[in-house]
């Protein structure tokens, strides 16, 4: 079984090792293989186009409380939202800018600094500085306040309960 197969389509251009995964997939008989994704797209590979497809739907989709905010100061608003959440509960902030993640951390009260982590690619360790972290054992969040960048957007299962703050910057 290959999970998040949509990631293979979008990232195979710059991650050649993903292409070999499909080669291994076809080594298995059709009854012993499957591809899974929540965001199905058409395949360019003719062999994959011939695969059986099953669309699964929720019987009772879970209800989520989603709040939408518009602002001219994303970093300040994000900092405020972090501080409004219960101090014992974990938080994930999805923001594809380490510079802005570090800026938000600076806007938090000093007592929160030790609770912050930036989960990003290995190539950004220096930019993340002392806040750099990876998922803990069992895919648990390493700190209470966790910023994640694009390398964690797909293909990563976080096995923890958390509040989610997603930041979209139209100017970037």
Predicted regions and their residues:
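Conserved two-lobed SF2 helicase motor
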Residues: 1, 140-155
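Interdomain hinge/linker at the junction between the two RecA-like core domains of SF2 helicases
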Residues: 32, 38-85
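Conserved strand-helix element at the start of the C-terminal RecA-like helicase core
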Residues: 81-109
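Conserved helicase motor
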Residues: 97-98, 117-132, 149-153
């Amino acid at each position: 079984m290959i999970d998040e197969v949509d990631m293979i389509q979008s990232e195979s251009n710059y991650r050649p090792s993903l292409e070999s995964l499909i080669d291994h997939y076809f080594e298995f008989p059709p009854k012993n293989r499957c591809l899974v994704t929540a965001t199905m797209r058409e395949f360019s590979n003719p062999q994959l186009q011939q695969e059986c497809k099953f669309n699964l739907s929720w019987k009772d989709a879970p209800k989520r409380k989603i709040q939408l905010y518009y602002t001219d100061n994303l970093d300040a608003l994000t900092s405020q939202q972090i501080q409004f959440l219960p101090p014992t509960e974990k938080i994930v902030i999805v923001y594809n800018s380490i510079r802005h993640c570090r800026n938000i951390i600076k806007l938090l009260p000093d007592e929160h600094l030790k609770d912050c982590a930036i989960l990003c690619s290995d190539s950004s360790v220096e930019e993340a500085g002392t806040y750099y972290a990876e998922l803990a054992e069992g895919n648990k969040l390493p700190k209470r306040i966790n910023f994640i960048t694009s390398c964690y957007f797909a293909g990563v299962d976080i096995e923890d309960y958390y509040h989610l703050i997603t930041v979209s910057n139209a100017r970037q």
